[in-house]
Amino acid sequence: MKPNFSLRLRIFNLNCWGIPYLSKHRADRMRRLGDFLNQESFDLALLEEVWSEQDFQYLRQKLSPTYPAAHHFRSGIIGSGLCVFSKHPIQELTQHIYTLNGYPYMIHHGDWFSGKAVGLLVLHLSGMVLNAYVTHLHAEYNRQKDIYLAHRVAQAWELAQFIHHTSKKADVVLLCGDLNMHPEDLGCCLLKEWTGLHDAYLETRDFKGSEEGNTMVPKNCYVSQQELKPFPFGVRIDYVLYKAVSGFYISCKSFETTTGFDPHRGTPLSDHEALMATLFVRHSPPQQNPSSTHGPAERSPLMCVLKEAWTELGLGMAQARWWATFASYVIGLGLLLLALLCVLAAGGGAGEAAILLWTPSVGLVLWAGAFYLFHVQEVNGLYRAQAELQHVLGRAREAQDLGPEPQPALLLGQQEGDRTKEQ
């Protein structure tokens, strides 16, 4: 690779709002999305909420002349909704399904059935290795009473760990998707602090689009105005994040969002705004790479966010244990009721009533049993994430005890050291 190596990457990301039978004008929006992607010819198009296999196959066929490589990440009952279209050959593919993803009995929210995940594709571009990730985290629904906060923090940590452990051979790391978190939210801070990823909106030299880079805006006719009432300018929950590793430098030359309507058609492509980033990658001495520098000033916010995440997971675990305990009491009461019904039926005094109550009592016990098992699984999932955070915090304390010099390699899993050894 030449010392003056330089590469331009054009990236597109959109939550397509492609729920079959529920999303308005879905077929028309998919058609216009395909036309737009063919016209712009991005290097990578990473999409969320393409729930329908028919929609994916339609886009795949329509985009094949411009984007010969495509993949649909399937998981859960109705699918993850994640798919990618690439102008360049995809060398490797994998995906990771999040351990925690809401509650199956919250059917009206539906996140549990989708199998939320993160997809990874590896590209080799002019001798450079690019790891591109696409993801969609659990929705918030109610910011004041967010019952999914612990799950979203656990997902953010799981995502950060997945990126950390799969990107050690990468030169450039790219993450796009609907994180369902505001920039200042705990999960978003945890993800960026632990991985060292940079926010394209904050880093760009040239921004065009909606105010404050928001990706759900009041101007969009598909967005619930009631949900955005506390946020008059909208919210920013979709991101393009990136970093360079091992002697490379990456910068965002331009970043653009759609603005809630299509000037040619009037209706937007989705209820979310599309993100378009132009990134430049070039050679740079390792010490000049901002993503590989972790001095004492950067460790303090990282430690704070790790501790805060540990606490939030603990609160979620306590809540999950409470529900599991409640379910166990219901199981006990249900079994006692069944025993009583058996006695009544055997005695013949109230046999008909006992028979009538038998089926709902069995249903109650089965429902409570499923409820108990699910929340026990939730406790274990939260405990696993909290234990990993506890280990990281313990390593950080060990690093601090080694002396006044910063020990970022210990805290960050010696990622840069491993990379240097491999080279």
UniProtKB/Swiss-Prot annotation:
Transmembrane spans: 330-350, 354-374
Enzyme superclass (EC): hydrolase
Catalytic activity: a sphingomyelin + H2O = phosphocholine + an N-acylsphing-4-enine + H(+); an N-(acyl)-sphingosylphosphocholine + H2O = an N-acyl-sphingoid base + phosphocholine + H(+); 1-O-octadecyl-sn-glycero-3-phosphocholine + H2O = 1-O-octadecyl-sn-glycerol + phosphocholine + H(+); 1-O-hexadecyl-sn-glycero-3-phosphocholine + H2O = 1-O-hexadecyl-sn-glycerol + phosphocholine + H(+)
Membrane topology label: Multi-pass membrane protein
Annotated Mg(2+) binding sites: 49
Residues of the active site: 272
GO biological process, one term: sphingomyelin metabolic process
Keywords on record: Cell membrane, Hydrolase, Lipid metabolism, Magnesium, Membrane, Metal-binding, Sphingolipid metabolism, Transmembrane, Transmembrane helix
Cellular-component GO terms for this entry: caveola; cell periphery; endoplasmic reticulum; plasma membrane
Localization (cell): Cell membrane
GO molecular function: metal ion binding; phosphoric diester hydrolase activity; sphingomyelin phosphodiesterase activity
Record site: Important for substrate recognition: 180
Functional pathway: Lipid metabolism; sphingolipid metabolism
Required cofactor names: Mg(2+)
Record region (Disordered): 400-423
Highest taxon of the lineage: Eukaryota
Keyword Lipoprotein on entry: no
InterPro entries linked to this entry: Endo/exonu/phosph_ase_sf, Endo/exonuclease/phosphatase, Sph/SMPD2-like
The EC number(s) this enzyme carries: 3.1.4.12
Pfam families: Exo_endo_phos
Family: Belongs to the neutral sphingomyelinase family.
Database matches in PANTHER family: PHOSPHODIESTERASE, PUTATIVE-RELATED, SPHINGOMYELINASE FAMILY MEMBER
Role description: Catalyzes, at least in vitro, the hydrolysis of sphingomyelin to form ceramide and phosphocholine. Also hydrolyzes 1-O-alkyl-2-lyso-sn-glycero-3-phosphocholine (lyso-platelet-activating factor) in vivo. Also acts on 1-acyl-2-lyso-sn-glycero-3-phosphocholine (lyso-PC) and sphingosylphosphocholine.
Record's protein name: Sphingomyelin phosphodiesterase 2
Lineage: Eukaryota, Metazoa, Chordata, Craniata, Vertebrata
